[in-house]
Amino acid sequence: MKRKVLLMGRSESGKTSMRSIIFANYIARDTMRLGVTIDVEHSHVRFLGNLVLNLWDCGGQEGFLESYLTTQRDHIFRNVEVLIYVFDIESREHQKDIKNYKSCIEAISQNSKDAKIFCLIHKMDLVPEDQRDTLFKNKEQEIRQASLPLKPTCFRTSIWDETLYKAWSSIVYSLIPNVKVLEYNLDKFCKICEADEVVLFEKATFLVISHSARKVHKDVHRFEKISTIIKQFFLSCSKSQANFQAMEVRNSNFAAFIDAFTSNTYIMVIMSDPTIESSATLLNIQVAKSHFEKFINSTSN
């Protein structure tokens, strides 16, 4: 099953850098050597086994954008499942950026009226921390106004923290069919294990696919932080030619289990009940693997 995803925005807004971090295992500092995208770069990213993201990374130079909106209009904007538009927060051509975005929205409305729209307000690490909330809200309001009658989902992002994983996890989640069936079964598993939380990660990208929680946690970005940390750990393992299989982290307050789950996922189980032995949790994970394999395969077919 293929899903066409457009990645658009002005030149040097950070589109190719974020794609390389999420899908090609780059670390943030290595993206500095990436060149400028010329015209359209196509990549096919296999996700959850049978789901293929047909990612069109569109160069943002003015000449290319004009071509996308005229001679290539139908070719670029037809059969699109998701449009990801990246705004560079430091751009000095603010009005032109909004005008170009509105032109893309018009083309999407005409050629792929059911496409989902995600706007990433990028390079937020360059904004003083005490100004980020206000700046993001103002930018989001302006983007929503420019998008009417479509309703975009906006995220603040940076390649230097977990916000990039938060945004892309949400984007990929929107592309997974029958994901509610998976969530229902994950809820049941969480209750059976008497876990505080259970999180499912895609194996190649370590993006969050789904999660279930029985206890409220104040840090809403915790999963994305874990994605970032574990992916860095995976890269370290691969450099030393070691294969990651499982991990258990325990202190006086909780135990966290991260284990290879199905052929395309990892699972994380968080436990705080001291009366439940590690062996019981590990057995539950082992027993659930074959059960979840069929649900995850069905969601990507």
Swiss-Prot record:
Single GO BP term: negative regulation of autophagy
Alphabetically ordered keywords of this record: Cytoplasm, GTP-binding, Lysosome, Nucleotide-binding, Nucleus
Entry-linked InterPro entries: Gtr1_RagA (IPR006762), P-loop_NTPase (IPR027417), RagA/B (IPR039397), Small_GTP-bd (IPR005225)
Keyword Nucleus: yes
Any one GO molecular function term: GTPase activity
CDD domains membership: RagA_like
Keyword Transmembrane: no
Disulfide bridge positions per record: none
Species, as recorded: Dictyostelium discoideum
Residues noted as binding GTP in the record, renumbered to the chain: 9-16, 57-61, 122-125
Function (record text): Guanine nucleotide-binding protein that plays a crucial role in the cellular response to amino acid availability through regulation of the TOR signaling cascade.
Protein name: Ras-related GTP-binding protein A
This protein's GO CC annotations: Gtr1-Gtr2 GTPase complex; lysosome; nucleus
A Pfam entry, by short name: Gtr1_RagA
Family listed: Belongs to the GTR/RAG GTP-binding protein family.
Localization annotation: Cytoplasm; Nucleus; Lysosome
